[in-house]
Curated annotation (Swiss-Prot):
Extracellular compartment residues: 70-118, 216-223, 324-341, 754-776, 874, 978-993
Gene assigned in the entry: Mdr65
Taxonomic source organism: Drosophila melanogaster (Fruit fly)
Organism taxonomic ancestry: Eukaryota, Metazoa, Ecdysozoa, Arthropoda, Hexapoda
Catalytic activity from the UniProt record: ATP + H2O + xenobioticSide 1 = ADP + phosphate + xenobioticSide 2
Protein name as it appears in the record: Multidrug resistance protein homolog 65
Annotated signal sequence range: none
């Protein structure tokens, strides 16, 4: 639809803050965490409370294990050294342990130690069972609620966006909602799922363990825990900084995603003007802020991790020294305040609590990220639409609508450009059943009237009346159900032809669909297609020619049988014969209903009951055609500017009515019997009826989504990823060394810890203090080394991962934009699907060399070193401790397998949801005009619910497997120390070696479990890498010739200059059963202007696309001068010779100057050249009249300009290129007659001295061509200049006569 006045966001010269911003998108502070659960039902709140209780129960096992472990190890020291019972114990006596002994013999101590071991094993087994059961619910409950939450979030966000008014969409054009629905919502899910349960478990565990430590020994606890406030503050500020960095990162990625969508949806324009390299560079520039923010996040994470772990070992050093001093001071006191048991409980309570707090850091980061992502999303969700299309409010007329329309003193300006006034007191009255044409220069406000009547916008002042009632009083759905519109640039949706027509009347029968298509002149070409009405039309109708799309759009409007028909350049893309047929159908359809016509064609407006000439936002003239011609005013001048002169002899020859009708019938028959076909093809087909169509499309998608993916070779994929990251190898090597060092450090601490128990057993206080001092210094050294290597490990792997992600995004985008155009015709490569791959899989791949790989290397190092140390001290106990490893490894492998099987299907369904979202939001005007809001919301909801099902299947065993891994470690503690106690009681093992072996191996196995938990992320990274490498490895079918291009003697002797098509046979790759060109031969000599004419869909534009090498012919050759464009010229060499102005010009979300300069991406185009090109295209005057002139932003896809203004910018863009060959594909179809004459003069001047190929239905634009070629049945059937073809009296002459009389 035409947009009549520039209405853009701020120019580049203005700051971002000055630019108008859509409501709900203003920057704001992150929301409170609990508000993330705002979409929970009462039942889900109950589940959350239950999950919280389970987390608390699970947390209680921590202090219980601390007490049990401390009591047992204290008894171990007492029994082994025959000190007697130095501590009162409370847990061990529950199952026969903890007997009090005084002056007992070694045998009695050994028997008591045996009982202690059995009691310890039973108690810890009970704790393991409790942890297992509570752990299952603490994971699954939060995952379940989070999944339901984000499903609702996605649906509510999409629904809110779809329900917003068009003015809001104009302002929000830079916001990438599709990416937000995928990435941002997924980050919210990550922040409110099982991580909440883990966080509650850690915090509650911290509180309880610290409280118990204080209750047992407040002096030691106070001394050791003095650093905990520092830990809490550090976590708080790190989370705060990372939240801000995350917001910056998301903003950058949103900009990159928006650019990617714009470029991929406009790939033909990008390719035509050689913009691939510059767009890739712009995309990379968008990624820079995100990369820098991520690097800072990595640095903060590394610093936090280093400080927390260093403080942990420092506290151990302090606890060792201070605790031993307290015990020695109390050795000779009868009522001892500190004993080994109390020391262990207080010490372990603080260590476990501090470790819990340290482990909350990544969770806090996830929560901060979730809050940041949710802030703007929730504002959009909460936003109340000013014009809500799904509102049930408003009046519905039960008695029917008459159709009286009146614009009453209307003042209007677009929300995105409030300083530009479009209407200035517009007054128009249209009686029911009248046909009224709105005319005027391009950009005067005609199409704005159409949009106001549809209530896309509301007037700033004044009112639009329908049956004497302000349209704001009517229900919007009811209002739009009585209005049908056919726009200048028709938008069709991915699906079948039948489905697209039925969108005008949901539930229409096949008979009604065919009747509407016949009335619109589309039935003939549809039935000539192999799949007829079941034929798929591609994304945005890409499988159809412009004329075919327009006829489908007209059929879609006619099937609605509206009270008011709005025709905004409805026949601009049709040839004149088709236009006559369709115009007759529209004239017939106009009977009995109010019709408003916006057109530059005299044939479309001459028969109107009233013609309204609009100038400067006001009505300048109105009346019938004859009245206005008699007035000889502005309308008269506009009509005269479009007159076409014909030779007198031809007029006489064809003056007899019968002869004219016979000629028309012959011409019509010749076109109707030709093999009308798609200009591009499709893959799938479905049945006719609407319900069956949707069911079969859904089934097809389901089969596609559920098809087993090609199994990737993980080793080869990982090798390629490492090769891709070779620039970061030095970081990876140093990071690997650091990760290995971290893995070695804990076994070293376990040995120190075991020696500390030996120090407690020293009877001489001096020896005990001396050994403790050495161990404390060793802990200090360990703290320093741990801090250093932890920082390096986290930062370096994050650094390498971020660079890999950034590089992979850029490389994938580069590979996409360099594919041949036919690749984008495949529905599997829709814009939404490709954007989802860029934003999703390129992020997933970071797991291959980022933190997951780091954790796995650390765990492997730790496990190997732990096994080595344990085997050194006691191989029997070591093997027993390793018994839980198969359980852990098996659990993780099982989980990884289940997740990897679901991840590809999940991504495919998400891509389909993204396609629906992208298609709907991008074409929101068409969605609104067709009242499809509820339909697209339902379709999107169905896909998102399928995503929920797949994720639920993926996570169904998550709680069990996670709890198995954690509980198995506790159970292993029970078995290991129980058996170790037996060995000590039998004199086979020193007691301190039990501590060394068990601590070393059990921590190693837990680390193995934690690292193997990264396996799903690592597996997902390899799957993502495999899918991205498929894109990177794909060689475009259209490439520059290989090797050196030779200048052969034959080429030197070939003196031909110009463009030559020889024996061209062609079918579109996605439509191999439909032949487009059948042996076409055509020569365009250097400097000639050659026009191609023929029926809509005959293949005229195909000739241009083959010349641009969008496709290559199946047979035959195309030459530019003496060079075969396939074998003798590079792609760039071909396209730099060409300048294109297409029927539906695509402009970018940039300034007018940047869009014009886009015509030549090989160099920096000066402002002088830009202005000169604009003047040549008759665009300079309207550009400088804008407040920001050439710096005016264009809006998404140039929506801030009228159709005529966009076309003139496109012409200027082609002229600035100074091409050798100029291609004009309906270059003036969107212009009013006056502007067309001026622009045509400019084009005539531009064509002077260069070769031009012109495609046009309006013969006024081609009558001065040197050669005119009529294409029929894929061949040139007539050619000559205008006078020659007229004198021949053939097809062209009859077509010309038709237009003259029309």
């Amino acid at each position: 639809m035409e947009r009549d006045e520039v209405s853009t966001s701020s120019s580049e010269g203005k700051s971002q803050e000055e630019a108008p911003m859509a409501e709900g998108l203003e920057p704001t502070e992150p929301i409170a965490f609990l508000k993330l659960f705002r979409f929970s039902t009462y039942g889900e709140i109950g589940w959350l409370f239950f999950g919280f209780i389970m987390c608390c129960i699970k947390a209680l096992t921590l202090p219980a294990v601390v007490i049990i472990y401390s009591e047992f190890t204290s008894m171990l020291v007492d029994r082994a050294m025959q000190f007697g019972t130095s501590s009162n114990v409370h847990a061990l006596p529950l199952f026969g342990g903890g007997k009090t002994l005084t002056n007992a013999s070694r045998e009695e101590n050994n028997e008591a130690l045996y009982d202690d071991s059995i009691s310890y094993g039973i108690l810890l087994t009970i704790a393991s069972v409790v942890m297992f059961i509570s752990g299952i619910f603490s994971v699954d409950v939060f995952n379940m609620v989070a999944l339901r939450q984000v499903t609702r979030m996605r649906i509510k966000l999409f629904s809110s966006v779809i329900r917003q008014d068009i003015g809001w969409h104009d302002l929000a054009s830079k916001q990438n909602f599709t990416q937000s629905m995928v990435d941002d919502v997924e980050k919210i899910r990550d922040g409110i799922s099982e991580k909440v349960g883990h966080f509650v478990y850690l915090v509650v565990g911290f509180i309880i363990t610290v409280a118990i430590s204080f209750s047992y020994g407040w002096k030691l606890t106070l001394a050791v825990s003095s650093y905990i406030p520092l830990v809490i503050l550090l976590n708080y500020y790190v989370a705060k900084f990372q939240g801000k960095l995350t917001a910056r990162e998301q903003e950058s990625y949103a900009g990159a995603g928006n650019l990617a969508e714009e470029i991929l949806s406009s790939i033909r324009t990008v390719v035509s003007f050689g913009g691939e390299k510059s767009e890739v560079q712009r995309y990379e520039n968008f990624l820079v802020p995100a990369r820098k923010a991520s690097q800072w996040k990595g640095a903060f994470s590394g610093l936090s991790d280093a400080v927390l772990k260093s403080m942990l070992y420092l506290s151990c050093a302090g606890a060792f020294w201070y605790g031993v001093n307290l015990i020695i001071d109390d050795r000779n006191v009868e009522n001892k305040e500190y004993t080994p048991a109390i020391l262990m409980i207080a010490f372990f309570g603080i260590i476990v609590g501090a470790d819990n707090i340290a482990r909350t850091a990544p969770f806090l980061e996830s929560f901060a990220t979730a809050r940041g992502c949710a802030t703007n999303l929730f504002k959009v969700i909460d936003l109340t639409s000013k014009i809500d299309p799904l509102s049930t409010d408003g009046k519905l007329l039960n008695y029917g609508l008459r159709g009286d329309v009146e614009f009453q003193d209307v003042f209007f300006r677009y929300p995105s450009r409030p300083e530009v006034i479009v209407h200035r007191g517009l007054n128009i009255r249209i009686r029911a059943g009248q046909t009224v044409a709105l005319v005027g220069s391009s950009g005067c406000g005609k199409s704005t009237c159409v949009q106001l009547l549809q209530r896309f916008y509301d007037p700033v002042f004044g009112s639009v009346l329908l049956d004497d009632l302000d349209i704001r009083k009517y229900n919007i759905q009811w209002l739009r159900s009585n209005i049908a519109v056919v726009g200048q640039e028709p938008v069709l949706f991915l699906g079948t032809i039948a489905q697209n027509i039925s969108y005008g009347k949901p539930g229409a029968t096949q008979k009604e669909i065919e009747a509407a298509a016949t009335q619109a002149g589309a039935h003939e070409f549809i039935t000539n297609l192999p799949e007829s009405y079941r034929s798929m039309i591609g994304e945005r109708g890409s499988q159809l020619s412009g004329g075919q799309k327009q006829r489908i759009a007209i059929a879609r409007a006619l099937i609605q049988n509206p009270k008011i028909l709005l025709l905004d350049e409805a026949t601009s893309a049709l040839d004149y014969q088709s236009e006559k047929q369709v115009q007759q159908a529209l004239d017939l359809a106009s009977k009995g209903r109010t019709t408003i016509v916006v057109s530059h064609r005299l044939s479309a407006i001459r028969g109107a009951d009233k013609i309204v000439f609009i100038h400067d936002g006001k009505v300048l003239e109105e009346g019938s055609h004859d009245d206005l011609m008699a007035l000889e005013g502005a309308y008269y001048n506009m009509v005269r500017a479009g007159d076409i002169n014909m030779p007198d002899e031809v007029e006489k020859e064809d003056s007899i009515e019968d002869t004219k009708q016979k000629s028309l019938a012959l011409f019509e028959k010749s076109f109707e019997t030709s093999p009308l076909n798609f200009e591009k093809g499709q893959k799938n087909s479905v049945q006719f009826e609407e319900p069956i169509i949707k069911a079969l499309i859904k089934d097809t998608n389901a089969q596609s989504a559920e098809a087993p993916p090609e199994k990737p070779n993980f080793f080869r994929t990982f090798s390629r990823i490492l090769q891709l990251a070779k620039q970061e190898w030095c970081y990876l090597i140093l990071g690997t060394i650091s990760a290995v060092a971290v893995g070695f450090l804990y076994p070293a601490f376990a040995v120190i810890f075991g020696e500390f128990y030996a120090a407690l057993a020293e009877k001489d206080p001096e020896d005990a203090l001396r050994r403790t001092a050495v161990l404390s210094w060793a802990c200090l050294g360990l703290a320093f080394l741990t801090g250093l290597v932890c920082f390096l490990q986290t930062y370096l792997f994050n650094y390498a991962g971020i660079w890999l992600t950034t590089r992979m995004r850029a490389m994938t985008f580069n590979a996409m934009v360099n594919q041949e155009v036919g690749w984008f015709d495949d529905e599997n490569n829709s814009v939404g699907a490709l954007s989802a791959r860029l934003s999703g899989e390129a992020v997933d791949i970071q797991g291959a060399i980022g933190y997951p790989l780091s954790g796995m290397i650390q765990a492997l190092s730790n496990f190997i070193s732990s096994v080595s140390v344990a085997m050194y001290y006691n191989w029997k106990l070591a093997l027993l401790c390793l018994a839980n490893c198969p359980i852990i490894v098996g659990s993780v492998i099982l989980e990884a397998k289940m997740m990897s099987n679901a991840v590809v299907r999940e991504k495919q369904v998400i891509e389909e949801a993204c396609r629906i979202a992208t298609e709907s939001i991008t074409n929101i005007r068409t969605v609104a005009g067709l009242r499809r809001e509820a339909d697209v919301i339902r379709e999107y909801t169905e896909e998102i619910q399928r995503v929920e099902v797949l994720i639920r299947q993926k996570l169904r065993w998550r709680g069990v497997l996670n709890s198995t891994m954690q509980a198995s470690a506790f159970f292993a503690y029970a078995v290991a120390l129980c058996y170790g106690g037996v060995l000590v009681s039998e004199g086979q093992l020193p007691f301190q070696d039990i501590i060394k072996v068990s601590e070393t191996l059990l921590y190693g196995s837990m680390m193995l479990a934690q690292s193997l938990a990264f396996t799903p992320a690592f597996s997902a990274a390899l799957i993502a890498g495999h899918r991205l490498f498929q894109i990177l490895d794909r060689k475009p079918k259209i490439q520059s010739p290989m090797g050196t291009i030779k200048n052969t003697l034959a080429k030197q002797l070939n003196l031909f200059e110009g463009v030559r098509y020889r024996g061209i046979q062609f079918r579109y790759p996605t439509r191999p059963d439909a032949k487009i060109l059948n042996g076409l031969d055509l020569e365009v000599l250097k400097g000639q202007t050659v026009a191609l004419v023929g029926h809509s869909g005959c293949g005229k534009s195909t000739c241009v696309q083959l010349l641009q090498r969008y496709y290559d012919p199946d047979e035959g050759t195309i030459h530019i001068d003496h060079d075969d464009i396939q074998h003798d010229l590079t792609l760039d060499g071909v396209r730099t010779k060409l300048g294109i102005v297409s029927q539906e010009p695509t402009l970018f979300e940039r300034s007018i100057a940047e869009n014009i300069a886009y015509g030549d991406n090989r160099r920096s185009v000066s402002m002088v050249e830009i202005i000169a090109a604009a003047k040549s295209a008759n665009a300079h005057s309207f550009i400088i009249s804008l407040p920001n002139g050439y710096d005016t932003r264009m809006g998404a896809r140039g929506t801030q300009l009228s159709g005529g203004q966009k076309q003139r910018i496109a012409i200027a863009r082609a002229l600035v290129r100074n091409p050798k060959i100029l291609l004009l594909d309906e270059a003036t179809s969107a212009l009013d007659l006056q502007s067309e004459q001026l622009v045509q003069q400019a084009l005539d001047t531009a064509c002077s001295g260069r070769t031009c190929i012109v495609i046009a239905h309006r013969l006024s634009t081609v009558q001065n061509a040197d050669v005119i070629c009529v294409i029929q049945n894929g061949q040139v059937v007539e050619q000559g200049n205008h006078m020659q073809l007229i004198s021949q009296g053939g097809i062209y002459a009859k077509l010309h006569k038709t237009q003259k009389d029309h």
